[in-house]
Design a protein with these regions (language model features):
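Ala/Thr-enriched low-complexity intrinsically disordered regions
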Residues: 32, 40-41
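Histidine- and acidic-residue-rich, metal-dependent catalytic cores
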Residues: 52, 56-483
Length: 483
């Protein structure tokens, strides 16, 4: 029977028969007794990963340029005032590193990636108000969260303190014995690049090179070390042209010189996803829950690695666009107004913008169609059954299960019976694939055990990050108050 599912999974012209086949499969499982159930369980073993690898390991088939492009487009949506900021800051740092010399391609790639990602902790409008002021002190929140995301979820842990201290003055940094000299220098370079961009992005300052140079001299060995100021002055970014907006072709070449490993690409993607999910305590595990349910269903239906991989990738990417939705809408403790609901629904279009042409059409469509319904009543395109293949239907169902079983600002977590009641009701109304819903009902306990196993450590990380945030904030504010 596994061969039947594998065939249907990939034969687009026969997908209409899929619900019938699943129903037949479930009927056979129930009627052939213990031996059939043992065989069904053994089918799981056939698609187990290699020893030492997670069942949920996946490969996102994108290049360095693609993964960085996804990150840049995502950050463009955090706030209009930060549009292109990370990319421009990375280019300024690139010019400073070129002026200094001595960096290996790997070091340059990692520091440029860090520059693109440096505001990953920024999502609160009130703090962004301060971030886009040229001279400001109230910016610890995003620096701490950015540091924690890098420390917990990336393979750039050794550079995470660069983000933590990228708004610290040189007078504070130079006496920190627990911070290495390379980290101090990189943090200073990042801060100076950040301030240069903020200054010249203000239309009033576009032609004002002299005031900026005066500012640098005033802050020499106070806010910025003499070393990094002189590095900046050795670039073409301030004298004579101030033309830092165009991205050098060499920048892209450096980013492609040393390809990211699959693990590194996954870590960048995870940071993006958790930066979105962690905006609310109610959605911490939403993406990973959706992904686990999706992959479990795909594994049960067909064991081909590439098919399961597409489903997993699509599920992981499905809510990236929520980075551009205001927190007050995501966290609204009640029914949204029609206007607010339209804003919320726009997250699918924003996801499409973020993904661009950086992923395959198969993966992109899985991500973009998770709110479509078989009867055409879904969004954003009102697609019908004939337009929706099995992988897309799987993720749509998994997303609903994750939403129902999780807490939200407007509801508590649904019980098993209530969740399955909603799903079967939607299947009976022709909204969801009845075959996949039937399989989920049959395997619900097993699938949700996998969800709990996978989400437990993430919840622990989330709580630990919250505790560390307050601890670090207290320490930094104490140091800031020292003479």
């Amino acid at each position: 029977m596994d061969s039947i599912f594998c065939s249907i999974f990939h034969m687009g012209e026969n997908w209409l028969y899929f619900p019938i086949l699943v129903d037949l499969y479930l009927l056979l499982c129930k009627n052939t007794g213990r031996e059939m159930k043992k065989q069904a369980a053994s089918n799981r073993v056939l698609v187990q990963p290699e020893r030492g690898k997670s069942m949920y390991d996946y490969i996102l088939p994108v290049s360095n340029k693609d993964i960085i492009s996804i990150a840049k487009r995502a950050f463009n949506l955090v706030d209009p005032r930060l549009m292109g900021h990370g990319e421009r800051v990375a280019n300024i740092m690139f010019q400073m590193m070129k002026a200094e010399g001595g960096y290996t391609p790997v070091q340059m790639r990692n520091l440029l990636t860090l520059a693109v990602l440096h505001d990953i902790g920024a999502y609160k409008t009130d703090e962004i108000d301060h971030m886009v002021e040229f001279e400001t002190k109230h910016v610890w929140n995003h620096s701490i969260y950015g540091y924690l995301f890098l420390d917990y979820f990336s393979l750039f842990k050794e550079l995470s303190k660069v983000v933590l201290f990228h708004h610290s003055s040189w007078k504070q940094l130079e006496n920190m014995d627990d911070v290495s000299e390379p980290v101090k220098k990189a943090a200073q370079m990042l801060q100076l690049a950040d301030r240069l961009d903020i200054y010249f992005e203000n239309p009033k300052n576009r032609m004002g090179r002299e005031p900026f140079l005066t500012y640098l001299e005033r802050e020499r060995d106070r806010k910025f070390s003499s070393e990094v100021i002189d590095l900046l002055l050795d670039t073409p970014l301030v004298p004579p042209s101030c033309d830092y907006i165009g991205i050098s072709p060499q920048f892209d070449r450096i980013m492609e010189t040393v390809p990211f490993t699959e693990e590194e690409k996954e870590s960048i993607l995870q940071m993006l996803i958790y930066a979105i999910d962690f905006r609310s305590p109610h959605t911490v595990t939403h993406t990973i829950t959706t992904s686990v349910i999706s992959s479990e269903l795909a594994i049960l239906l067909c064991g081909q690695k590439h098919a399961v991989n597409d489903v997993m990738c699509g599920a992981m990417l499905h809510d990236l666009g929520k980075i551009g939705i205001p927190v007050e809408i995501l966290e609204y403790p009640g029914k949204l107004s029609p206007q607010a609901m339209n804003v919320m629904r726009n997250h699918v279009n924003l996801t499409e913008y973020i993904l661009g042409d950086s992923v395959s059409d198969a993966v992109k469509n899985i991500a973009l169609r998770h709110h479509e319904k078989l009867d055409g009543s879904g969004y954003p395109r009102g697609l019908r059954a004939a337009d929706l293949n099995v992988p897309q239907r799987i993720v749509a169902i998994a997303d609903i299960v994750s939403a129902l079983t999780g807490t939200r600002s407007y509801k508590g977590a649904y019980s098993k019976n209530r969740t399955l009641g909603v799903l079967t009701g939607m299947a009976e109304q022709g909204l969801l694939d009845s075959g996949i819903v039937g399989l989920l009902v049959e395997r619900y306990d097993e699938i949700m055990d996998s969800v709990r196993e996978k989400t437990g450590p993430l919840l622990e990380k989330y709580q630990e990050m919250q505790d560390r945030y307050w601890e670090i904030l207290y320490q930094l504010e104490e140091k800031e108050g020292e003479p």
